[in-house]
Amino acid sequence: MARLSSLLSFSLALLIFLHGSTAQQFPNECQLDQLNALEPSHVLKAEAGRIEVWDHHAPQLRCSGVSFVRYIIESKGLYLPSFFSTAKLSFVAKGEGLMGRVVPGCAETFQDSSVFQPSGGSPSGEGQGQGQQGQGQGHQGQGQGQQGQQGQQGQQSQGQGFRDMHQKVEHIRTGDTIATHPGVAQWFYNDGNQPLVIVSVLDLASHQNQLDRNPRPFYLAGNNPQGQVWIEGREQQPQKNILNGFTPEVLAKAFKIDVRTAQQLQNQQDNRGNIIRVQGPFSVIRPPLRSQRPQETEVNGLEETICSARCTDNLDDPSNADVYKPQLGYISTLNSYDLPILRFLRLSALRGSIRQNAMVLPQWNANANAVLYVTDGEAHVQVVNDNGDRVFDGQVSQGQLLSIPQGFSVVKRATSEQFRWIEFKTNANAQINTLAGRTSVLRGLPLEVISNGYQISLEEARRVKFNTIETTLTHSSGPASYGGPRKADA
């Protein structure tokens, strides 16, 4: 009994110590008296583009537990495969291209049809990706017989003109939101004529990130000559790809290649960075262009696995918006009900597009931090903290970032012809509460509570409670515009 008591006392002391250590890591990190519209603090230049990194040590980003990155890929630019130790949610702010990801342990479901042609057969549809996740039947047991299959593929490459097989490749375009698990390698290629701009939020505070709160890209190819300049206290030196750390002899044995080729994999003399320019055609197996949004179908719970999970959805189609008013704009949300993979990432997104003088009614995030990135236009934004202080009151414009901590109230009003933004939220099913409007917190209070709480008459309380009949979007031209009865359409 005494031994059990001692063990419990030790466990309790250890728990208190660990809790205290965690709390002291960033004391009062969310006691924010002022927010700022943030610009990138570091720019990593490459041959065919650049990577812009925001300072994740900024108090408002540190409070939210996230970092933010913008990738600008020029035409024919290839962002070489890399992965992070954190969950990542990305948004295509501009342009179009291709995106590929490699999920550990999953089979190559995109393949040249000539792979399966008999020796004397005439290949049909060569170079076209079958790309059907339903081909899993043809790949059963692939993991067990993979090395043997590689040998067969080597023979086929000599006798049948075998080209390639790889994991899923998708077309991406403006408005696409892309969810990526930790450890999943990802690459992008710009096959359009304008720059491909992708912004990403990395959830550094995620339970899946077992490292510290620093964004750490792991490069499978390419390099970063400037080094990880955003990590404080680290000696700055060029960041190489992870193959560079192994000896060429080890790589030669692992890949069954000669030492000279193994040295090429290490990119030691390559200063192109991690976004390179492709010379000539970029021939990968790709599917046909997809429709605006996948058709909703009934599922039995077995169709989607980690290998076949859908990881993209487009938020730029007003016909799929959650809130839509032709004269004001629209708001679309993306959560784990729309994209089940977000349940594991514990992230979600909101896309907004409003016209000049339209206003998003005052609201706060009930269960998530939010990071707002402006993709087009300008808006006047006010943010109020838990102390009732206005911690931000100013303009945000294209390319700027504003972090809005959980519970902080915010109102947005478009000051340009059109204001468009994307918000990333640190909850798979983020919830908002509004201060004004048909579904607001004040609408749910009794008149007597409002009257006594604000020391106003019952008639004034009635106007406060019922005058705004919209739920999310309204005009900001002043009370005079609400003189007559209107139809509740938002």
From Swiss-Prot:
Residues 122-148 have a biased composition (Gly residues). SMART domains: Cupin_1. The keyword Phosphoprotein applies. One of its GO terms (biological process) is seed maturation. Residues 113-164 are annotated as: Disordered. Residues 1-23 form the signal peptide. The modification Phosphothreonine is found at residues 109, 426. GO terms for molecular function: nutrient reservoir activity. The modification Phosphotyrosine is found at residue 330. Keywords: Disulfide bond, Phosphoprotein, Seed storage protein, Signal, Storage protein. Transmembrane segments: none annotated. Residues 149-161 have a biased composition (Low complexity). The modification Phosphoserine is found at residue 332. Hexamer; each subunit is composed of an acidic and a basic chain derived from a single precursor and linked by a disulfide bond. Belongs to the 11S seed storage protein (globulins) family. This is a seed storage protein. This is Cruciferin BnC1. It comes from Brassica napus. The gene is BnC1.
